[in-house]
């Protein structure tokens, strides 16, 4: 696959039109807004930076790197172990459901894009979108850092678009937020990918509480 094709594939994976349900979940933000924890744009940016620093950089990216390497080596046992670890790090039923739902949706795309994906790997990808992204990145020969950029941009854009609906704020403010959050992501991503095993784990108790409370929130825009 040429470099141009690989870049276009990365754009497709980061696209908001990718039908994996990324815009259906707020990861607790909806309850945090109702509780008054995130009343404005500045508070939203602080909230999202904290989720990135204490969650995405310490759980998602380190585990994505391990899943990618397991896929490179064809080590299904290691990939299963790290996927189970990822699900264990999702601290609420809502977050685990999101992970599995997005994984199942991505696996359906994977079946169309790569119908020769072996059944054990396809079954694993149904449990987590990270596993599917890792397998596909290896199959398409896209390097880990580039896949991590696509993954991060998709996560940032989904979070900001949830903020537009909930906080709320306008599209111009949203684009400024995406710019600043992407700069922070790009600066810290290499360190996150190199996280040692012993440092994997989240430290976002308020986000976990918000997600748990969102499960029974009376009026909701986002899934639970």
From Swiss-Prot:
The keyword RNA-binding does not apply. One of its GO terms (cellular component) is cytoplasm. InterPro entries: UreF (IPR002639), UreF_sf (IPR038277). The keyword Chaperone applies. UreD, UreF and UreG form a complex that acts as a GTP-hydrolysis-dependent molecular chaperone, activating the urease apoprotein by helping to assemble the nickel containing metallocenter of UreC. The UreE protein probably delivers the nickel. Required for maturation of urease via the functional incorporation of the urease nickel metallocenter. Keywords: Chaperone, Cytoplasm, Nickel insertion. It is found in: Cytoplasm. It comes from the Bacteria. Belongs to the UreF family. The lineage of its organism: Bacteria, Pseudomonadati, Pseudomonadota, Gammaproteobacteria, Enterobacterales. It comes from Klebsiella pneumoniae subsp. pneumoniae (strain ATCC 700721 / MGH 78578). This is Urease accessory protein UreF. One of its GO terms (molecular function) is nickel cation binding.
